[in-house]
A protein has these predicted regions:
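Alpha-helical interface subdomain recognition
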Residues: 1-100, 109, 122-127, 134-139, ...
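Short glycine/proline-enriched turns and hinge-like loops at secondary-structure junctions
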Residues: 84, 154-157, 182-187, 201-205, ...
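N-terminal glycine-rich flavin-associated loop
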Residues: 104-126, 155
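A short, Trp-centered hydrophobic/proline-enriched beta-strand micro-motif
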Residues: 138-147, 192
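Glycine-rich phosphate/pyrophosphate-binding beta-alpha loops
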Residues: 152, 177-184, 268-272
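Cytochrome P450 core scaffold surrounding the K-helix E-X-X-R motif
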Residues: 153, 220, 250-255
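Flexible, small-/acidic-enriched active-site or ligand-binding loops
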Residues: 158, 216-245
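A short core secondary-structure module
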Residues: 168-169, 173-221
Length: 382
């Protein structure tokens, strides 16, 4: 078993790392300033500037693996990207996680990544041309509407949103929440999951349908803050769908295939999120160590107190273990497929956030009262 990185893996990871350290990190204060000015729900200029720079450098659309193990509905519209494997991209995603807005710079931010995968695997040529191409070019944003306030949405078969066919249209009624990205003024299209046939088998009742956000009957009711943070300019919204009509051509893959699409979509996304979470943890650990070395108490640096030595050691152990598990899951997805890797994918979904929360919490404690302020970025990371 060889744990060394290949030349290609190192090449792409290092390109992303170097771009972030040279371009993104030096502009982080500019980002925070622009984010705080005026309307919360806006396009942030420095992000657009960095996107253009990354695109020109060819560090763009890194997330799309060359194959999912399933034939595509359409192969006439190609995806423009380097075709990194899940493992190769996982290493890049960790670097992006170190600064919260970095993934958007490379056009690799959720939910667009998962939605582009849906279009690529399951979309028709027309659906790809209309929606995937502008997403691929970084011109628009998108949303994925599955979770509902009235049911336990971790079980996707509970979804209650109604999708009733009337002639050449579907009429959609329901309420979604935690609809990430809807607050962005560039968000133009949503993939909505609902039920088209309540009499079908349990996992064949659901469908996924494309709903333009400017369609009559789409109403953004409110934004949902997370621990008091609005996560602007993307946000998480509650969206009401009231008698929304869309053409039948907007259904993806066909009626009754929604659960199947959801399963195919969520696997790669968990690799992305978990590896970015490792980046968040690494950043928190670095801030913690810097703080502990810069402060003294009882005649020695705080870092020299045994409790902090233990916490730092535990943080390093937990990060290394989590990274290995994530990379194993990514490797399995590339070599044996997402279905066989389901166990590992489920494990990282639990391990990565638990690991990061503990390290961020320790970093907050190391900063004292400053840890819960906005000065160090730890409260928002938590």
């Amino acid at each position: 078993m060889d744990f060394s990185l290949t030349e290609r893996q190192s090449y792409w990871r290092d390109r992303v790392r170097d771009f972030i350290e040279t371009n993104v990190r030096p502009n982080h204060d500019v980002y925070l300033q622009q984010d705080a000015e005026g309307d919360r729900w806006k396009v942030i200029p420095i992000v657009e500037e960095m996107k253009a720079k990354a695109k020109a450098a060819g560090i763009w659309n890194l997330f799309m693996p060359p194959s999912s193990g399933h034939p595509h509905v359409d192969d006439t519209v190609e995806f423009e990207g380097p075709g990194l494997t899940n493992l190769e991209y996982a290493l890049c995603a960790e670097e992006m996680g170190r600064i919260g807005w970095a993934s958007e710079v490379f056009n690799c931010s959720a939910p667009d990544t998962g939605n582009m995968e849906v279009f690529m695997r399951y979309g028709t040529a027309e659906q790809k041309r209309k929606w995937m191409v502008p997403l691929m070019n970084g011109e628009i944003r998108s949303a994925f509407l599955m979770t509902e306030p009235a049911v336990a949405s971790s079980d996707a078969t509970n979804i209650q949103t109604s999708m009733r066919r009337e002639g050449d249209e579907y009429v959609i009624n329901g309420t979604k929440w935690w609809s990430s990205g809807v607050g962005d003024p560039r968000c133009k299209i949503a993939i909505v999951m609902g039920k088209t046939d309540t009499e079908a088998k349990r996992h064949q009742q659901q469908s996924q349908i494309l709903v333009p956000l400017d369609a009559p009957g789409v109403n953004v009711k409110r934004f949902l803050p997370v621990f008091g943070y609005d996560d602007a300019p993307h946000g998480h919204m509650e969206v009401e769908l009231k008698d929304v009509r869309v053409p039948v051509e907007n259904v993806i893959l066909g009626e009754g295939r929604g659960f199947e699409i959801a399963q195919g979509r969520l696997g790669p996304g968990r690799i992305h999120h978990c590896m970015r979470t490792i980046g968040v943890a690494e950043e928190a650990l670095a801030k913690m160590c810097k703080r502990l070395l810069s402060r003294t108490a009882f005649g020695k640096t705080i870092a020299e107190h045994s409790v902090w030595e233990e916490r730092i050691a535990r943080a390093r152990i937990d990060i290394e273990m989590t990274r290995l598990l994530c990379l194993k899951a990514a490797h399995m997805m590339d070599t044996v497929g997402n279905k066989i890797a389901a166990g590992e994918i489920a494990m990282i979904k639990v391990q990565a956030p638990n690991m990061a929360l503990k390290i961020i919490d320790d970093a907050i404690q190391a900063h004292g009262g400053g840890g819960v302020s906005n000065d160090f970025g730890l409260a928002s990371a938590y």
